[in-house]
Amino acid sequence: MKKAAIIGGTGYGAIELIRLLDSHPYIELAKIISQSQHGELLDETYPHLATYVTQPMQELHIQQLIEEIDIVFLATPAGVAKEIAASFLDSSIQCIDLSGDLRLSSSDYEMWYQKKPASEALLEKTAYGLTEVFQEKIKQANIISNPGCFPTAALLGLIPMLENNIIESKGIMIDGKTGISGAGKNSSAKTHFSTTNENVTPYKIGTHQHIPEIEKYLSQHVEESSVRVTLTTHLIPMTRGLMCTMYAPLQQDIDTADVIDLYKHYYEQSSFIRIRKQGEYPSTKDVTGSNYCDIGAYVDKRTNQLIISSAIDNLVKGAAGQAIQNINVMNGWDEKTGLSFLPVYP
Amino acid sequence: MKKAAIIGGTGYGAIELIRLLDSHPYIELAKIISQSQHGELLDETYPHLATYVTQPMQELHIQQLIEEIDIVFLATPAGVAKEIAASFLDSSIQCIDLSGDLRLSSSDYEMWYQKKPASEALLEKTAYGLTEVFQEKIKQANIISNPGCFPTAALLGLIPMLENNIIESKGIMIDGKTGISGAGKNSSAKTHFSTTNENVTPYKIGTHQHIPEIEKYLSQHVEESSVRVTLTTHLIPMTRGLMCTMYAPLQQDIDTADVIDLYKHYYEQSSFIRIRKQGEYPSTKDVTGSNYCDIGAYVDKRTNQLIISSAIDNLVKGAAGQAIQNINVMNGWDEKTGLSFLPVYP
Amino acid sequence: MKKAAIIGGTGYGAIELIRLLDSHPYIELAKIISQSQHGELLDETYPHLATYVTQPMQELHIQQLIEEIDIVFLATPAGVAKEIAASFLDSSIQCIDLSGDLRLSSSDYEMWYQKKPASEALLEKTAYGLTEVFQEKIKQANIISNPGCFPTAALLGLIPMLENNIIESKGIMIDGKTGISGAGKNSSAKTHFSTTNENVTPYKIGTHQHIPEIEKYLSQHVEESSVRVTLTTHLIPMTRGLMCTMYAPLQQDIDTADVIDLYKHYYEQSSFIRIRKQGEYPSTKDVTGSNYCDIGAYVDKRTNQLIISSAIDNLVKGAAGQAIQNINVMNGWDEKTGLSFLPVYP
Amino acid sequence: MKKAAIIGGTGYGAIELIRLLDSHPYIELAKIISQSQHGELLDETYPHLATYVTQPMQELHIQQLIEEIDIVFLATPAGVAKEIAASFLDSSIQCIDLSGDLRLSSSDYEMWYQKKPASEALLEKTAYGLTEVFQEKIKQANIISNPGCFPTAALLGLIPMLENNIIESKGIMIDGKTGISGAGKNSSAKTHFSTTNENVTPYKIGTHQHIPEIEKYLSQHVEESSVRVTLTTHLIPMTRGLMCTMYAPLQQDIDTADVIDLYKHYYEQSSFIRIRKQGEYPSTKDVTGSNYCDIGAYVDKRTNQLIISSAIDNLVKGAAGQAIQNINVMNGWDEKTGLSFLPVYP
């Protein structure tokens, strides 16, 4: 039984980690750490955890963690995580950072996050936790940068097609749609029910920090120059769920059926990727509460475009679920351990 | 490992049973039976079950079930269930009926359901599956009538107060609020998104078949005459969740704190009942996806009324979850077996 | 053409007044006043008003208002309104206060709002703006206290029954359900989408400031002692809409049909009250965006209770619409002036 | 006062026409015709129309209409409309067809609708009712083919850019998002609340009948060859509202500010088009219940793409509102007549 701690215990990422870890057979959640609310009981904020919570949230003590804990999940905001992660560099702690701090090169991080980047030493030791694609690196790493929610859905849909030279590396459009929980727990106009309900709201057009993240990891899969993508993101009036509808120019004449076969082959060993059959496309509700990423595809012969639809639960495969999946891989456990439940439907 | 079958495999009750049984350690779901869709794969209707489903739904063969199966869940409509349940009377099958067929006396059933009632022989052998209250009878029964969703929330809130003579048995008002999944999977004006979204819709006022069910089981807890309740039900624009807000005249001068203590004491041994502390009330979201029933109370001294708020997930504690809880009790397993997960929040 | 000003221009009450006044034939909205945001353009906060807004919001200058303006709508928070309203006491300004400041007696206000009450001089000159019931007083008043949203729905349903001695004045239960816009424009956990969506949340049980308001105006309609009601309120995952489901002990043996006839007779002259026929009940969506209050009733012979269901749009009949209806009555215009549009459906 | 009739009186298009015509100063709605429900009162299906409806729906009698009526709105399904419209060819009736029957060339109609097309005589006399762009033709026509909901939003965003050679005519991607009312009044899995709530559902990918409609009217604005677009459509869990997020390769180096100026200039005379300022994008809620189309734009210099976001209420500008706007133009009235109300917000 490994001992885990969550740092940043009061956001939605942490709350979902708590739910998922509760049924993990090899991990015991030993500490929930919150700098802003230590001393408080978590179920005062989250009554759905009534009877679950037995001890108050704790302050952060790095040395104590290094001594007592095996696994640390960083569910802190960008900017905070990189400092904490650096403290574990020389320890044996397995650290999963759910923020964006360790996802980009220093220069890109500075430009898109407008914060000071993590040290090169830290970035070099960090593996990007898109489990299905980077699991060899994940197995050997102690520090994982857990992917952003849009990048998870986008990369899982695009990488197999780019690797197989099905689509061009230029002219890829990603239309992202996310539930409001993606905007976090803080109250603002952006998360106000009366503002967001019965509404579709585009946001951060052209400026979303997930753009360079998607481009960085796509570029690792084509030889030549760097890939550029266009990403728009939209708030959808639902709590959970994220979809990327993607458009990419075809490099070759291919049928939908063959594209689907390619996907199936690519993800043959991946328990959490489900490919829809021809003529069917995933809905976000098909994956709610689960770690699945469902993918559908359509070759538009009229316009020579491949249309890809990729759906995840932003809090599971897009955050806490993938974090646990990475921990499973790092520890040599089956990637499904503690994650093999069906979606909650309807 | 016990073998289970679900009969009526395509409604929401069945779908939730499938989700929950999938993580039950002692039950294997061996057969999904559907008279209307046998031969089909369930994931054609429900793509969220993709990769889970490996064999088509089957026709109903009673004798085969008796030979091969240990546990049968009846997720069929009222009217159908009682015929099937009767076939198992002399077998060793443990049968849980999720319909209303076995919940009322013959005369009440005829009046409120306007169908021919089950045989007296069947009714006599049936235990009412409100697990927390009737577990002694459930342990000894082979046939369980699983409670309706409103009765579950209402009875769990009212019974401790009636038993302890806190409230009068006359003048109880129950204001029921349910998510649209309570109206089932069939498409109609009542379940149409454009009709029900951004809407509160009262329905079946004074005529809901859950009225006699609540009255029957409340009456078993007061000596004198029969209890009468007023129940209204409202469709709420959400998928899951059910709340009963209840009003009952106080029999004695008592404080909120004492009422809360009484509840805590009454449900001391019950894993799934959580009592809110003074000044707090449950939201339906606090129990989503879980088998919990959360209860809050307030003594309104100004009007001498007890106000009780009781929240469940209508598809879990109000249907499939309680069915499995009953099976656990019938088999001597911990009632939490396969049901000990946290709510999905947010 | 009368000139109007709105004070407190950035809340939902003001925004709805702007929408409704825009099509009023006899009122010109001359000023929008905001102490916190004067100098700003309202469409920066509310882009749906783009092209409508031509001048910035202004500071409050009482004397200037008295000289230039005929009608003032106070859409300010409780506590602020009573100070401003007092300034108009000796002027010819018609002032409608949408806050709770002028609704209660001094002692009740102090107890339930926990603020210093308005002066007796102001309270004496104020008429309560439940248009259908108090129009004679409204015609003669210059200062109107516009009713709260729950009291509007509750009183319109209860008063005809109390006046006609159909129901008892004791044992009335009001189960209130409101859309999230009722919680206002400010961001908080209570208005957060992820918290409130897919959820029913009871709040302020036993402590809602609308309780004494309902009781005060009900009591004016029965000779004997004062009426006491039990009110609970619930947040429903919708933006607009409010329903009171009410339960009251019958004083006499009467049929549903006769109750409905009584309502129809009582509201014969009232353009905005629509009585549902026997067996039908209003949904909140039936009145969305309109000034209607729809009422349905059912005599529960089994329990000797009258069940009343009353639905309004909380921002229209529950706030801005009724405010304009009152202005119409005060000026001798048809009460429908500027308000005679159909509900927005679906 | 012109007399109008609606044929197909029970769908959402008709219901919205009734709401809007009710406040039109020059049009009297004289007849509501329904082949399937004639003899019934419309408020039996739609209680929000209680007190509005005074006469039952009628059967269709073409000759009677020609004699008594000036304006006919066809709110019938595709396939039915073209037969009725043909009957008015030699009459003086102004006919607006809200279905897709008259929008495409015969060959395209046959291919995409898989029905027999309208006669050439009828198609030749029909003007396409995208009011802002085709008003000269609309003024001279008696028969109008009212645009589809997605084409309205897409064309209003794309045409000014194509006409001004800002974007290429190849490689245009349109990501469409619509509220569930776009799927109509009929109950099906696609409109079931429990299926569609908390969900984003792609549908008709590559096969939507709005694809050839968009292409046909875009092609009329570029000299050379025909334009091809990629369109995907998604059901969003909201009742009303439609957004097209569009991506098009830039033909020239241009700044966002200049693009916005071009839009403003193009729509200078158009009362219902509102262009967002730089850095802001429309939400569907900004136009709910109104005839506005709000447009925002962003030049993505990184990828040399123009991103356009265009939002309408699918039932107003996307159907009934635009139909009335066309009637206004045909009769020489101000296009805003009866449509100049503000959006319903929040």
UniProtKB/Swiss-Prot annotation, chains A, B, C, D:
The keyword Cytoplasm applies. Its main location: cytoplasm. GO terms for biological process: L-arginine biosynthetic process. The keyword tRNA processing does not apply. One of its GO terms (molecular function) is NAD binding. It holds the Pfam family Semialdhyde_dhC_1. Catalyzes the NADPH-dependent reduction of N-acetyl-5-glutamyl phosphate to yield N-acetyl-L-glutamate 5-semialdehyde. NCBIfam families: argC. Belongs to the NAGSA dehydrogenase family. Type 1 subfamily. This is N-acetyl-gamma-glutamyl-phosphate reductase. It comes from Oceanobacillus iheyensis (strain DSM 14371 / CIP 107618 / JCM 11309 / KCTC 3954 / HTE831). The lineage of its organism: Bacteria, Bacillati, Bacillota, Bacilli, Bacillales.
